[in-house]
């Protein structure tokens, strides 16, 4: 284990087009095989599509979508006396943001539209309206935490 303590958190650099750090985080989540130019093209085209379909600012819509996907609670496994309990815990803001981006991109990839740009556009629009698979994942996570509320005293 390192003796110096945890590495400091580096600030997220805002993207050059929208000037929003959340967009550059989304680009990095879409990124595959180091092809950042392609990832940026996908995200920027998707955000342009969101602005065209929605008539509102794309970054505002993206933030609204992430607010609808961001979880407040999750369950963590905790072993107590030979049995494993699913213990509900509050999600820290940084992890909640990371999970929201991960779920948004994962469920965008699994959609049926032809191009990744269309998939991401429609998933962002669905999430901003409270629909879509990413929002359902958040609801399932909250439901799981609610049903295991009896084990909340095992929190650490």
Swiss-Prot record:
Alphabetical keyword list:
Ribonucleoprotein, Ribosomal protein, RNA-binding, rRNA-binding, tRNA-binding
Q: Name one GO biological process term.
A: translation
Concerning Pfam families, the annotation shows: Ribosomal_S7
* Cross-referenced CDD domains: uS7_Bacteria
Q: What's an example of a GO molecular-function annotation for this chain?
A: tRNA binding
Query: Could you name the Gene Ontology cellular component terms for this entry?
Result: small ribosomal subunit
According to the record's subunit comment, the protein's assembly and interactions are: Part of the 30S ribosomal subunit. Contacts proteins S9 and S11.
- What family is this? Belongs to the universal ribosomal protein uS7 family.
Q: What is this protein called?
A: Small ribosomal subunit protein uS7
